[in-house]
Amino acid sequence: DFPALCLDNPVAYLDNACVTLRPHSVINAISDYYVHSPGCGGRSVHRYGTAVSKTIANSRKTLAGFFNAPSVNEVIFTRNATHSLNQVAKGLHWSKGDVVLTTDREHNSNLVPWLQLEEEQGIDHRVVPSNADNTFDLEAFEAMCADAGNRLRMVSVSQVGNLDGVETPIREITKI
């Protein structure tokens, strides 16, 4: 399904926060858009713009159902994970001393925004260390959450490491 993986000497590609490989179905849909619907959704009232607006509304509805979102208004589209993380980091109101937890295995997309906010606004960015086997240290995470107390504003972790493919136990993290 992924043409980039069918080339000579394919790679194990894990850098999806930057650019995700696209399957044929996505490539074909993008090509179809440029041929049949080259309009601006939500802005244009001509045939192309109206078609794009309907497609976006239907996509939002489908995704809201998939993610069990209470409203289609909670579904937004961004360019990529980097853009999304920057929107969250820069879009929230932060107070000096607010704690943000990340891991020691984060992609720069999930590290740089917090380092910038630490410098610019005085948030307290803390890094959860990995275990010796490079897995997520749930005990250290729980202790760091307890230490932060009510100053903990954000836990921002990658589900899978882009360099090594090691999974972060998201379900367990959400229970803490």
Residue spans for each PLM region:
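Pyridoxal 5′-phosphate
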Residues: 1-176
